[in-house]
């Protein structure tokens, strides 16, 4: 049986990346919440995976 998680950096960034977050109203809300909470990493990026 095939596993459900097949990692792809491109798909990950297109769904959860900074540019996508900024392009949508709800995404900007997510970023502001994470900023106010004091998160070091606001979004998932290629650098955060390694």
From Swiss-Prot:
One Pfam family hit:
Ribosomal_L34
Q: Which NCBIfam families would you find in this protein's record?
A: rpmH_bact (TIGR01030)
**Has UniProt tagged this entry with the keyword Heme?**
no
**HAMAP family attached to this UniProt entry:** Ribosomal_bL34 (MF_00391)
Q: What biological process terms from GO does the record include? A: translation
A Gene Ontology MF term for this entry?
structural constituent of ribosome
Q: Which cysteines are joined by disulfide bonds?
A: none
Domain of life assignment: Bacteria
Q: Which family does it belong to?
A: Belongs to the bacterial ribosomal protein bL34 family.
Keywords, sorted A to Z: Ribonucleoprotein, Ribosomal protein
Task: Please report the name of this protein according to its UniProt entry.
Answer: Large ribosomal subunit protein bL34
Q: Name one GO cellular component term.
A: ribosome
């Amino acid at each position: 049986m095939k596993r459900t998680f097949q990692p792809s950096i491109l798909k990950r960034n297109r769904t959860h990346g900074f540019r996508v977050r900024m392009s949508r109203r709800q995404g900007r809300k997510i970023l502001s919440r994470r900023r106010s909470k004091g998160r070091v990493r606001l979004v998932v990026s290629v650098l955060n995976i390694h």
